[in-house]
């Protein structure tokens, strides 16, 4: 069966709707992932995802779990739209007379989609990580200040709390990065983002397409929406875990603020080498469980919205009065 002609506006709208719904549902888990990945040996603020979320609520309130969400909600629409539309475009260009794509061509289409999306993904992740990790650094400094005060007072209760550091905002961060580093400041970690997102797309899109094909009743029908959802969840979580080592390195490289006694890095290889040497190979899987929990529903929801054709329906309603 020939693929239907791509409607770019519809694909962009579908990707945007899916991104907004998905981010709203899973952002607290993404915050826990960032904070767990940024923990280096020594001071460990959080033992697990649940411990991180509980401590975040206690110290920063419920909305502390959504710190940095505004950046994601603003930029996830173009990011997801570019990713899904680019994959559709490349699949359409690589197909011949509607024939099923071979695996190498599916991987090539995914590679193209992953490369296109980093235009938006890199600055979005750069800003989001600073906002998400600010609470961890503030809590660590407060704890260390309290411990130091206890030591000087001989075990008595601390009489004065450490002054709270002002919370950064996305606007302040953007202004500072542009003023001090130019546009390159927003694209710090671009190489690491490419090394994460291109392999992710190479794994995700072919795996999703084949899993979704398995649940299709016949070659002339679409897969049921629940099949698309499950295929998106399975493919998303598998791809997320596969590229988690690159995500750990990317998160460390894009973090501007460091906690006490935490390493600094000069580049991707330097970061990977120091993580291996100081924390062991298991450190590359930090946050993998959280990342799978984030990506699975995010891409499951995305594919359901995409395959239900919500945007096509909306655009059709808008065009009806003109008919």
UniProtKB/Swiss-Prot annotation:
PROSITE patterns: SOLCAR (PS50920). Gene3D superfamilies: Mitochondrial carrier domain. It comes from Rattus norvegicus (Rat). The keyword Hydrolase does not apply. Solcar repeats lie at residues 6-93, 101-214, 223-312. It is found in: Mitochondrion inner membrane. The gene is Slc25a22. This is Mitochondrial glutamate carrier 1. Detected in insulin-secreting beta-cells and pancreatic islets (at the protein level). The lineage of its organism: Eukaryota, Metazoa, Chordata, Craniata, Vertebrata. Pfam families: Mito_carr. Its main location: mitochondrion. Belongs to the mitochondrial carrier (TC 2.A.29) family. The chain crosses the membrane at residues 12-32, 62-82, 107-127, 189-209, 223-243, 292-312. One of its GO terms (biological process) is L-glutamate transmembrane transport. It comes from the Eukaryota.
